[in-house]
Regions:
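Nucleotide-sugar donor phosphate/pyrophosphate-binding loop at the beta->alpha transition
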Residues: 119-138, 184
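Short, conserved loop/helix-junction motifs that constitute active-site signature segments
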Residues: 100-107, 133-142, 193
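N-terminal pre-catalytic "stem/leader" segment of glycosyltransferase-like enzymes
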Residues: 1-96
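Active-site proximal beta-strand in glycosyltransferases
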Residues: 83-90, 101-123
Length: 200
């Protein structure tokens, strides 16, 4: 059974990220993976600074996840052929996972979902575009596949990040539009029986 390390985005109840936290491990297991969830340590359970996530908390959460990943490599607990699935590719340090695998002479697959970033001018992190435009391309280069929720995100990333840096030919095939994953178990069917309506 292949090993999959699930590196979740913070599971906030008011966001779909809580659904992902519950449902992705089960989905990966049913696909035949041995799943290990690498939880982070949040500072907040609500958004105080930022919009989609609390920026202070998300940086802390992801840095504690990265520390655990480094420890797993150090302890030789990452089997060759492992998969790392990141619930948020906007993960400062994701390129370190590629380096850890290379330096430990392990073949791993790094993949995940990119919600938004400085490349989406409507995003709170658009303020980081002067420097994050380079790290975003680095994140994609470190990954084998990056999923995005819409054609808008696919084209925005290509047009605002890859093409200006001359990286489109090499990296665009790593971007894949999937839509935002939803799980049927979160949306129970409501019985809406058909009835004759009498209009008076």
């Amino acid at each position: 059974m292949p090993q999959l390390f699930y590196v979740p985005i913070e599971p906030l109840v008011e966001r779909y990220t809580e659904s992902w936290y519950r449902n992705f491990p089960t989905t990966f297991r049913s696909a035949g993976f041995d799943v290990t969830v690498i939880d982070g340590v949040p500072l907040e359970d609500e958004v105080k600074v930022g919009t989609f996530l609390d920026v202070n908390s998300t940086v802390h959460y992801k840095s504690t996840q990265l520390a655990q990943i480094a420890a797993l490599f150090n302890q030789r607990r990452v089997p060759n052929g492992s998969v790392f699935f990141f619930g948020d590719v906007e993960f400062w340090g994701i390129e370190s996972v590629r380096l850890l695998a290379q330096m430990n002479r392990l073949d791993v697959t790094i993949t995940g979902f990119l919600h938004a970033g400085s490349y989406t001018i409507e995003d709170a992190f658009a303020v980081a575009a002067p420097y994050q435009q380079y790290t975003e391309v680095g994140w994609l280069a470190a990954c084998d596949r990056v999923y995005v929720g819409s054609d808008y995100h696919y084209h925005a990333f290509r047009e605002r990040r890859l093409i200006p840096l001359g990286a489109d030919d090499n990296l665009r095939s790593r971007l894949m539009v999937t839509g935002n994953p939803l799980f049927k178990s979160d949306y129970p069917l409501v019985d809406v029986s058909k009835r004759n309506k009498v209009v008076l």
